[in-house]
């Protein structure tokens, strides 16, 4: 599992 910060949108994509 990892968390990748989506720059610009300011949201976080959570991939398990």
UniProtKB/Swiss-Prot annotation:
Assembly: Gamma-delta TR is a heterodimer composed of a gamma and delta chain; disulfide-linked. The gamma-delta TR is associated with the transmembrane signaling CD3 coreceptor proteins following the stoichiometry: a single gamma-delta TR heterodimer associates with one CD3D-CD3E heterodimer, one CD3G-CD3E heterodimer and one CD247 homodimer forming a stable octameric structure. Upon activation, gamma-delta TR complex associates with FCER1G to initiate intracellular signaling.
Q: What is this protein called?
A: T cell receptor gamma joining 1
Query: Does Membrane show up as a keyword for this record?
Result: yes
The source's superkingdom equals Eukaryota
Q: Which example biological process does GO assign this protein? A: adaptive immune response
Kindly list the places in or outside the cell where this protein is found, as annotated in its UniProt entry: Cell membrane
Protein species of origin:
Homo sapiens (Human)
Report the leader peptide range: none
